[in-house]
Amino acid sequence: MVEVLLSGIVLGLVPVTITGLFVAAYLQYRRGNQFGL
């Protein structure tokens, strides 16, 4: 039962983590372009 709960947590966190990293990289890219880097 613990394995099912753990796999559910992992499956829920992975897309959120990937999305967060993508958004952070995108914002950093946008900010870098504004300063002409």
UniProtKB/Swiss-Prot annotation:
GO terms assigned for molecular function: electron transporter, transferring electrons within cytochrome b6/f complex of photosystem II activity
Gene Ontology biological-process entries: cytochrome complex assembly; photosynthesis
Main location: plastid
Xref: InterPro entries: Cyt_6/f_cplx_su5, Cyt_6/f_cplx_su5_sf
Subcellular localization: Plastid, Chloroplast thylakoid membrane
Membrane topology: Single-pass membrane protein
Keywords, in A-Z order: Chloroplast, Electron transport, Membrane, Photosynthesis, Plastid, Thylakoid, Transmembrane, Transmembrane helix, Transport
NCBIfam families named in the record: PRK00665.1
Chain's role: Component of the cytochrome b6-f complex, which mediates electron transfer between photosystem II (PSII) and photosystem I (PSI), cyclic electron flow around PSI, and state transitions. PetG is required for either the stability or assembly of the cytochrome b6-f complex.
Protein's name in the database: Cytochrome b6-f complex subunit 5
Organism: Emiliania huxleyi (Coccolithophore)
Underlying gene: petG
